Swiss-Prot record:
It is found in: Cytoplasm. Keywords: Amino-acid biosynthesis, Cytoplasm, One-carbon metabolism, Pyridoxal phosphate, Transferase. Belongs to the SHMT family. It is an enzyme of class 2 (transferase). Pathway: Amino-acid biosynthesis; glycine biosynthesis; glycine from L-serine: step 1/1. The gene is glyA. It comes from Thermoplasma acidophilum (strain ATCC 25905 / DSM 1728 / JCM 9062 / NBRC 15155 / AMRC-C165). GO terms for cellular component: cytoplasm. One of its GO terms (molecular function) is pyridoxal phosphate binding. The record marks H224 as: Plays an important role in substrate specificity. One of its GO terms (biological process) is tetrahydrofolate interconversion. It comes from the Archaea. Catalyzes the reversible interconversion of serine and glycine with a modified folate serving as the one-carbon carrier. Also exhibits a pteridine-independent aldolase activity toward beta-hydroxyamino acids, producing glycine and aldehydes, via a retro-aldol mechanism. This is Serine hydroxymethyltransferase. (6S)-5,6,7,8-tetrahydrofolate binds at L115, G119, H120, I121.
Length: 426
């Protein structure tokens, strides 16, 4: 049965590709890679190992790997305007692990966004911070503006004196108030760590905010959301040499050995493409997000942060508690071929994670395959018909498939490729 089992897995992978190729992906944490990035992902690099830094390896056979990593660092330095870059983390959470091991130890206090306020699970007491045995305290959150309250948070920092102030959210609609809180950071002498996983591509495109120039010592991130590369991680710095050395030691030998060389190379290619196409891509993402949010709001959905224009990023949050709840809405839309996720909102208890009040929507992948303002309006109409008018999911799914058929080619990159085709080798 072994071959049949292998064929079964292959068939399921092909069906998975077909599902996304025929559907509209609005998950805020996903994207599709460019042809060149995907090409190096299946190169011989995927089979090889490298430990340590370029030209100081523990393995032979790394001559070309070193050249690739050198160039990747150069591209990241140019893109983010810093000499401190590390492309080795194998995911955003892996990068976060290295950061917390470098910046804080057991018993230290770290200020973080709350989970229901959009914070990432790695920054929760049951995530990496808890595993490091640090103490956490959450910033006061302004539900009207859907961001940290800078005045109250500054007072908290001065009173509690955390060793590290962590910013960054998985529902990241507006810039973190780094500049507004700079005086508090300086008064207590804390390190400022910015988790830019969701908005890294917007930052690369010169949009949203510039954390390294606004006071962040360290920026961590994954490289497959608004930054449209492989599932990998990166760390950027604007800090003292001692702290940067601690970060690099935490990466290796701290939280990884080999750093997935194919993904590192794909990251470098994506950085090169971002230097050429990133500004336009970031502009189009934000423009599309605003249009979709406005249309959903006009159609009767409770899209949050209406007074602030709904969003300044790729993401919007929608309170669907009166539409059946996050679980029902996400599952219903999946039946229609529209893929997004349920999400906690600031007033939700963490215990409601399986059926929260909200949904989270991201437009970076739809934008990546060429969708624009008119398609955003059409998507809003399809969502409205499914959730508010309760139309037949199969009917809507057929219309989704028809719409998506014209938007499969990856844009904002070198070359042309169907982003959803399954690559058969045998």
């Amino acid at each position: 049965m072994s071959y049949e089992d292998a064929e079964y897995i292959r068939e399921m992978a092909m069906k998975h590709s077909e599902m996304f190729g025929e559907g509209i992906a609005l998950i805020a944490s996903e994207n599709v890679m460019s042809p060149l990035a995907k090409e190096v992902m299946i190169s011989d690099l995927e089979s090889r190992y490298a430990e340590g830094l370029p030209h100081h390896r523990y393995y032979q056979g790394n001559y070309y790997v070193d050249l690739i990593e050198d160039r990747t660092n150069e591209l990241l330095s140019k893109l983010f305007r810093t000499s401190q870059t590390d492309p080795r983390p194998i995911s955003g959470t892996n990068a976060n692990s290295a950061a917390i091991y470098a910046l804080a130890g057991p018993g230290d206090l770290v200020a973080t966004p709350s989970l229901s306020g959009g914070g990432h699970i790695s920054a929760a007491e049951f995530g990496i911070l808890g595993m490091r045995s640090v103490r956490t305290i959450n910033y006061p959150y302004d539900m009207d503006t859907m961001t940290i309250d800078p005045d109250q948070a500054s007072k908290m920092i001065i009173k509690e004196k955390p060793k590290v102030c962590l910013f960054g959210q998985s529902v990241f609609m507006f810039p973190a108030p780094l500049k507004e809180m700079a005086e508090a950071f300086h008064e207590v002498g804390c390190k400022v760590w910015y988790d830019g996983a969701h908005v890294l591509g917007l930052i690369a495109g010169g949009r949203f905010q510039d954390p390294l120039r606004e006071g962040a010592d360290i920026v961590t991130g994954s490289t497959h959301k608004t930054f449209p590369g492989p599932q990998h991680g990166v760390i950027l710095g604007n800090t003292d040499d001692e702290t940067w050395k601690a970060v690099r030691r935490a990466v290796f030998p701290g939280v990884l050995s080999n750093h997935h060389l194919n993904a590192m190379a794909a990251l470098g290619i994506t950085a090169a493409e971002e230097l050429e196409f990133g500004k336009r891509y970031a502009d189009d993402i934000i423009s599309n997000a605003k249009v979709l949010a406005e249309e959903l709001y006009a159609n009767g959905f409770n899209v949050l942060a209406e007074k602030r224009g709904f969003t300044e990023s790729h993401t919007m949050a929608v309170d669907v508690s009166k539409n059946g709840g996050g679980k029902y809405v996400a599952e219903t839309l999946e039946k229609c071929g529209i893929i997004l996720n349920k999400n906690l909102l600031p007033w939700d208890d963490n215990k409601k994670s399986q059926n929260p009040s909200g949904i989270r929507i991201g437009v970076q992948e739809a934008t990546r395959v060429g969708m624009g303002k008119s398609e955003m309006k059409e998507i809003a109409s399809l969502i409205t018909r499914a959730i508010i008018r309760h139309e037949d999911p199969e009917k809507i799914k057929a219309e989704v498939k028809q719409l998506k058929s014209g938007f499969r080619e990856v844009k904002y990159c070198y070359g042309k490729m169907d982003g959803y085709s399954y690559i058969k080798l045998i």
